[in-house]
Amino acid sequence: TLEISFARPTPLTLGFAGMVIGVILYLIWTNLIVTAWSNATNLTDGLDGLAAGVSIFVFGAYTFIAYFQRIQACTQPDVNRAACYSTRDPLDLAIFCAALIGALAGFLWWNASPAQIFMGDTGSLALGGAVAGLSILTQTQLLAIVVGGLFVAVVLSAVIQISVFKATGKRVFRMAPLHHHFEL
């Protein structure tokens, strides 16, 4: 089986394909998630404090998601077995998120406009990788699109700008990604 999740894991049985195809599809899906979130965060890091500020809210949401999954874990004695989560070590994930929030808050102090330091590609790709890893480990890959909606909007603005410009020669936004459009 393969699991697709939004708020709760939903098994997707690939009986005709067997276990090997399920593993291959999972690996492709995981690589797609990590690549997408890393690049989305990297695109968002073009404005002082934007990637760090948005990431604080994303990791805050994942702190609550992981803690809720700890409370509703299948290993808890008086939990409804039909509505429990089988996430491995959710409390550790919540602590990891809280540590990232603290680190980003300290970083944001020096990165707010006018920025004295910046995280660069290494920092933004690491933040995107952390979002991807958390979404995979908590089995909330599709919910991550809602939680990190600003990252998705930035990527979509760049894709729309490039696609429309190649097709018509006209720009939809004065500048892409979206946060640079609002600067002008």
Predicted regions and their residues:
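Alpha-helical transmembrane segments
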Residues: T1, V23-L184
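Extracytosolic (periplasmic/ER-lumenal) interhelical loops and adjacent juxtamembrane/interface segments
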Residues: T1-M19, T75-N80
